[in-house]
A protein has these predicted regions:
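Glycine-rich oxoanion-binding loops at beta->alpha junctions
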Residues: 65-85, 108-151, 156, 163, ...
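Short glycine-rich or small-residue beta-strand-to-loop segments that form or flank ligand, phosphate
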Residues: 68-70, 93-99, 147-154, 190, ...
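Extended, charge-enriched "interface" segments that sit outside catalytic cores
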Residues: 1-89, 339, 346-350, 354-357, ...
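Glycine/threonine-rich flexible loop motifs
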Residues: 157-164, 343-347
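Short helix-loop-beta junction
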Residues: 110-122, 170, 300-311
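Conserved phosphate/anionic-ligand binding catalytic regions in large, soluble enzymes, centered on
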Residues: 95-110, 222-229, 380
Length: 384
């Protein structure tokens, strides 16, 4: 595959863009972002980057708390570790995250990538009201050894509360059958929500085993490095110090004022420039070991950019095809984990690496991101 676009520092973005017109468009966008100080304005919570409407600017500025999450939640690591150890010591063997969208997708990424940590809980994510999906989530689990995590920013998410009601009934029946003297299934439930009315809206909130209150200025799909992601991480046995250190390392790199040196800004500006050039579909090609990040990215990208009749259409889990199968409207992002098995080859035996090389040669932009360890997913939560 040809060399990456030279405008970017090697550790910022590996972008293979053979089409000269697309390369020029990206370079022009980088120059504009630098001239208009996009990076500094983002970290200053300057809503004028996105809108000229003062009301919209204020709303946006009040939703940028995710910029502080890696630092703010570092102080919570001892308490989170104690919580995880306490749940394990209490005899819990599994946990179910009952949430939708942003409240469930980051936990799903972590539950899949760290599912083999010996001695810790099995974590499953319930984010579909399909009865078959609900039964699958509970299949094989002991209701009396399963912690239910009710995750809802608003406290009124219909699906999350429906999952809670279903879990309540299952646990109540199991308690009666076992002759247990616990007064309430609430002993086996916790909540992750916002303070105030959000908490008050959750049924049985005053009797739950524990409640974790998230910052109000963090939107659901940006909450991976808040309690939404960190509470499940504590139950999976993830090294929280290392996890947040990875996020802080990436956050520090995203303070580089020059877009060419900034992993987050380089990615965002590139995708924006390519979208303006007609590349409005992003196909993620991830190693199976980190494939669940695709669902998280789908929601993050689609819900964040899909406004006012425009946006990038993310595509995850689609088998990679030959170059001739695609119109000139695609961007491909390869997410690889060192030492992990790559995506399966095509029935004809063509590997993902060979297909991506052919796609780049045919003029499709190919961006490559490599993780040294699953713990580096924390950095990707920041970068994207």
């Amino acid at each position: 595959m040809a060399d990456p676009l030279p405008i970017f520092a090697p550790d910022a973005l590996d972008a293979r863009i053979h089409d000269p017109a697309l390369a020029r468009a990206v370079e022009a966008a980088v120059r504009r972002a630098d001239a208009e100080r996009w990076v500094e304005r983002l970290h200053d919570r300057d809503g004028t980057i996105w809108s000229e409407d003062p009301e919209v600017q204020a709303r946006i500025a009040n939703r940028l708390g995710w910029l502080d999450a890696p630092r703010d939640f570092g102080d919570q690591v001892p308490a989170l570790e104690a919580f995880g150890e306490g749940i394990r010591a209490a005899g819990f063997t599994a946990a179910i995250v009952a949430g939708m969208g942003g409240s469930s997708l980051a936990p799903d990424v972590l539950a899949d990538a760290f599912r083999d940590v010996a001695g810790w809980l099995t974590v499953r994510v319930l984010d579909s009201t399909d009865p078959a999906a609900v039964e699958a989530a509970w299949d094989g689990l002991d209701p009396l050894a399963t912690l239910v995590i009710v995750a809802t920013k608003s406290g009124t998410t219909t699906e999350s509360l429906a999952f809670q009601a279903d879990a309540w009934a299952r646990i109540h029946a199991a308690l009666r059958a076992a002759g247990e003297r616990r007064e309430s299934p609430a002993d086996l439930m916790i909540a992750i929500t916002d303070p105030g009315r959000s908490l008050e809206a959750i049924p049985h909130h005053d009797g739950l085993r524990e409640v974790f209150l998230n910052p109000e200025d963090v939107g659901g799909r940006y909450s991976a490095l808040t309690y939404v992601g960190l509470v499940p991480a504590s139950l999976l046995g993830i090294d929280l110090d290392a996890f947040l250190a990875a996020s802080l390392a990436m956050l520090a790199r995203t303070h580089a004022t020059a877009v060419a040196d900034n992993p987050g800004a380089a990615l965002g500006v590139t995708l924006g420039a390519l979208w303006r050039a007609g590349r409005d579909k992003l196909t993620l090609v991830a190693d199976p070991a980190v494939a669940r990040v695709g669902a998280w990215l789908e929601q993050l990208i689609a819900e964040s950019t899909g406004k006012h009749g425009v946006g990038i259409v993310p595509v995850a889990g689609e088998p990679l095809g030959e170059a001739s199968a695609y119109r000139p409207d695609r961007v491909f992002v390869r997410l690889a984990l060192d030492g992990a098995a790559p995506p399966a080859p095509t029935p004809a035996g063509t590997s993902a690496a060979e297909l991506l090389e052919a796609l780049a040669a045919a003029g499709h932009p190919v961006l490559r991101i490599r993780l040294a360890d699953p713990i580096d997913l924390a950095g990707e939560f920041v970068r994207w």
